[in-house]
Swiss-Prot record:
It holds the Pfam family RNA_pol_Rpb1_4. Transmembrane segments: none annotated. Belongs to the RNA polymerase beta' chain family. Binds 1 Mg(2+) ion per subunit. Binds 2 Zn(2+) ions per subunit. This is DNA-directed RNA polymerase subunit beta'. It catalyses: RNA(n) + a ribonucleoside 5'-triphosphate = RNA(n+1) + diphosphate. Mg(2+) binds at D449, D451, D453. Zn(2+) 2 binds at C818, C892, C899, C902.
Amino acid sequence: MLDVNNFEYMKIGLASPDKIRSWSHGEVKKPETINYRTLKPERDGLFCERIFGPMKDWECSCGKYKRVRYKGVVCDRCGVEVTKSKVRRERMGHIELAAPVSHIWYFKGIPSRMGLVMDMSPRALEEIIYFASYVVTEPGDTPLEKKQLLSEREYRVYREKYGKGFSAGMGAEAIKKILADIDLEKETNDLKEELKSAQGQRRTRAIRRLEVMEAFRNSGNNPSWMVLDVLPVIPPEIRPMVQLEGGRFATSDLNDLYRRVINRNNRLKRLLDLGAPNIIVQNEKRMLQEAVDALIDNGRRGRPVTGPGNRPLKSLSHMLKGKQGRFRQNLLGKRVDYSGRSVIVVGPNLKMYQCGLPKEMALELFKPFVMKELVGRGLAHNIKSAKRKIERMAPEIWDVLEEVIREHPVLLNRAPTLHRLGIQAFEPTLVEGRAIRLHPLVCTAYNADFDGDQMAVHVPLSAEAQAEARILMLAAQNILNPKDGKPVVTPSQDMVLGNYYLTLEREKAVGEGTIFKDINEAQLAYQNGYVHLHSRIAVFAGSIPNERFTDEQRNQLLITTVGKLIFNTILPKSFPYINEPTKFNLEIETPAKYFVDTTTDVRAHIAAQELIDPFKKKILGNIIAEVFKKFHITETSKMLDRMKDLGFKISTKAGMTVGIADILTLEEKHEILEKAHDTVEKITKSFRRGLITDDERYERVIAVWNAAKDEIQGKLILSLDRLNPIFMMQDSGARGNISNFTQLAGMRGLMADPSGRIVELPITSNFREGLTVLEYFISTHGARKGLTDTALKTADSGYLTRRLVDVAQDVIIREDDCGTDRGLTIKAIREGTEIIEPLEERLEGRYSRKTIRHPETKEVIARENDLITEAIATQIVDAGIEEVTIRSAFTCNTKHGVCKKCYGKNLATGTEVEVGEAVGIIAAQSIGEPGTQLTMRTFHTGGVAGDDITQGLPRIQEIFEARNPKGQAIITEVGGEVVSIEEGRDRQQEITIQGTDDRRSYNIPYTARLRVEEGTIVERGEALTEGSVDPKALIRVRDVLSVQEYLLAEVQKVYRMQGVEIGDKHVEVMVRQMLRKIRVMDTGDTNILPGTLMDIHTFTEANREAILSGSQPATGRPVLLGITKASLETDSFLSAASFQETTRVLTDAAIKGKRDELLGLKENVILGKLVPAGTGIGRYRKLKSEVIKETAEVTDEITNI
């Protein structure tokens, strides 16, 4: 077998007739498949054993030679070679066609490659190929021209007139002759000459022809090979025929298509032998052409060939295309052995790195390991008896199983895998039942809940796979979210509620002001009912094992609550004692105001103090992030487990319930509604008098009701008891938000109708009172819209992720430093006056491009190429610096990837990024994964002429596909001062800008809102009106970097508006991929074709060579491609073909004789090679492992890694 990891590239091209014959093991002459009585393949048929190999291993067809000892013998009776039956998957056959046939891909594709080579229109080609017209192949000395079309009548007239003085033909034969006569060298030179003077359409056509001619010249393909003389027959096991239980056969569609070809071919041969009339022969040739077309790409021309029930048959092209095609179904995703799936249930007592595997499942998954161990222990004599023991489930196998799975991690995956945390490794523990147990804290990462979700289990087999699973994928390692570097394993629901309840403070609770000597005493008092969890007490600070207290504080009393004492036991000893949810307390120390001298009157002191807020979900997240920063992975995962256990325990103790009595209605609600009704009445009066338009009336009514709802909500919050269970649930962040509560106890407010327009009739009732029939009906629209939106959004978001992954899959960290001298100058991203993304967030984890100094003291804050940590970022912002130049993926010089310095910190680990990290895929997942959280709506914003601004998912798609945005802003092409804004015709406004050497005027539609006024100084490319800028226009007016910065800011605005944080670097990686191509305008003295789309690196390389040799370099202009287009324009044809438009990509690649250098991930997955990322990268593959010494017994627990 071919070693998959041993070849460097893959090449595709056209096959010559001789090449096809050389692949073949024999000619298929008959359309028969299998004899229905003997069930043996027919000789010379589509399943013939003589051509394709034996049906049974080591056995010829007639049974004369059986067993492996006759290996390689060809039977003298039936002619079948004695070998493995597996060869029926690889041996090909062929059909000698009685007449040449054109290949539909090259004739029918857009543009028609055959048409370009022959300089004929596809219409004319179709007429020739399908025998409607003659074409002159050799005009001789007649006035006819070569390639001139003649109708049947004209042909007869000219034949009588000139006799044999010219030759003309029809069908693929004539095409083949013309193609064979083409002199590529001469045609190419003629076209180059033509290009010098040609303009418009002629120039475009010449460039396209030249591209195809050059492709044929450089690839060594012969244009006449686009016409087939010999048709390859694919191996029979790939188009199988199987017997069903009723004695009938099920067969692949390809066999039907092949049978049609063979039948027609044989009939044509017979007609030719008989010397049939020309018209009959031509008809048969046309039918043969159509049969081959249907085999290669059914349905591409005319009506598709259908099978039973009018179903179009699946041809060779369909086998490759789409989600069910060969590429996406079998090559990019395969079903694997050693895997299983089951329903998940919660495992609250598991450790962070554990999962519960059902016994039966574990036994099946680890079967070979168990069998080996049974034999090794002498519990079974051989593998067979071990297998029988397992099938009988003998009692002794369970101990063995437990031994086998110890320290053998398994991978758990939940579909859809939206980001890399969708697959994590756990150490299995055996559990009874049939459900997988999952640790509650990893649910957020998987987006899993226990309402019937299922998960898949995979077993890593090799030692390397196990080591990678343990070191890189263990759930305890995946604490940070790759998209923003924040902890992803934050507690949720019950755990949040428990910790919130635990840290509550209550005035005058039982035992308030009691002084305790240590924690144990306080806990004892609590267990015996002398104090409550919420009681504020004093405890001797020296008894608390916290290393952050000063010596003076150790001799004082600490004012705290019993609950907070218990809460702080879960934190590391050297972490500050947390008494209040503030940044100061978390990061620096416990505030001094909580320490009092032992002589103080504690009760009076406590009574004078205000109550402190309990610890909500966000604070718990901050605590986890701080612990991670200071103590790293091991300590954090242990602390998380303690936090989880404590949360569950206390929320059980708290016994939160929701009763109808907890929903208290508001007294003032009635009068607020009355007031609103009056205001609406006044607005309607103004409208009736014609003082305002209907649109204005609508907007104002909506505003009134929204204000009424907000007022009710505000009063509700104030009237609520802090210990109300519903309030506690939403305040802690466990579940629900304040608007849910408003709907229960206040009013439901305004609803949208099916079109998304807000109905101006508000729902004034709440759920506590109940809705009227009309109100209920109005609210059903919103409910239904919510559900349909979610369903549509999921599909859209998934498709977006797929396109993003495809365009960035080959971006990998390739080197330590690319040595670039360029950088990106960044400042806080703003929308008007509001800061969308502050500067320190953008700086953290990046490398500085220039030395950063304090503007006043001139002291160095960070040197060039220093990593900017959180502390340095804060220092920079505190120094009043507003913009900083950093290293960025935009300006990185690395080919096919990014370097470590330009990328910066790996957000998923919080450390420097490693060479080999697949940052492209991480970026795509980070942008795609929150896609489902974005809204689908196009907001209708206020004002009469309110433009629809696209937001949410549609806006993200618009940006990444580089489409013309909705509500487009008008941009200026000159920089300078706005000298006048005047009203022109049709109430349009005319803005005039005076540049340094140019004056421009722009007509602005009446409805647009201006962003400038007279006297404003504008730069080139700046927007004059509100709305989104078209990036394609921006790239024309300004430079690439401005476009990159604009796209980055726009993406961040959409996500931040929805409260989703994404690291800048992910967007940078994606945007860089959209701008990696250049369109050649002037070719200079290089041999590049004009109008070619080239990779910037290849272009620069070609120009460098030109300059070194002293010739004229080419010039080009950067092009912004949408992600779909960029994916299809990639250098790798395997990656592009497996993405979309498979036949077009393959046609193009075959003619150009393309080489795929296998640089990206997809190409290598398709070929079954190790991906060139992570540990599959060259520098890691060359490492050799050696045994230093054997360990006697592994005593370390897994958490001590």
